[in-house]
Amino acid sequence: MEPEEGTPLWRLQKLPAELGPQLLHKIIDGICGRAYPVYQDYHTVWESEEWMHVLEDIAKFFKAIVGKNLPDEEIFQQLNQLNSLHQETIMKCVKSRKDEIKQALSREIVAISSAQLQDFDWQVKLALSSDKIAALRMPLLSLHLDVKENGEVKPYSIEMSREELQNLIQSLEAANKVVLQLK
């Protein structure tokens, strides 16, 4: 059965089976932030424009099945148009590199936020008095943050009371729960 144009990965059928593992692992390398495969290695199989579609389709496929955490049966259903050698190769790649793809997807999500905390420092100070009240005896937290935004590190300094610190901690704990749910 010939794969139909428009089904996932139909262009992969042109690839000789012995080149499948090499191509798929290089595409996963690209997803993980390393080098994607180069057209020169596959110019005898696909035209230039078709090559771009191959890369895009396979990368989307891997991201989708790992991101959705699809079971093997559902993955095989999506691959039923391909020959058994290509199906087997894809499944081996997915099983062996699933964790790497998942980490790459997490990094992509984290990178959506343009600002990232690079470093921090804190001190607790005791305010003994102010110009309005003779004796305060109130603990204050001085928090110094180095935030990387658009490649540039910007320093921020914040002074907080006990209540403000408690609110910050609660917000950070809530954000941490969301991050843990993404893993």
From Swiss-Prot:
InterPro entries: COMM, COMMD4/6/7/8, COMMD8, COMMD8_HN. One of its GO terms (molecular function) is NF-kappaB binding. One of its GO terms (cellular component) is cytosol. GO terms for biological process: signal transduction. Pfam families: COMM_domain, COMMD8_HN. It comes from the Eukaryota. The keyword Transmembrane helix does not apply. Widely expressed with highest expression in thyroid. Residues 116-183 form the COMM domain. Component of the commander complex consisting of the CCC subcomplex and the retriever subcomplex. Component of the CCC (COMMD/CCDC22/CCDC93) subcomplex consisting of COMMD1, COMMD2, COMMD3, COMMD4, COMMD5, COMMD6, COMMD7, COMMD8, COMMD9, COMMD10, CCDC22 and CCDC93; within the complex forms a heterodimer with COMMD4. Interacts with RELA, RELB, NFKB1/p105. Interacts with CCDC22, CCDC93, SCNN1B, CUL1, CUL2, CUL3, CUL4A, CUL4B, CUL5. Scaffold protein in the commander complex that is essential for endosomal recycling of transmembrane cargos; the commander complex is composed of the CCC subcomplex and the retriever subcomplex. May modulate activity of cullin-RING E3 ubiquitin ligase (CRL) complexes. May down-regulate activation of NF-kappa-B. This is COMM domain-containing protein 8. It comes from Homo sapiens (Human).
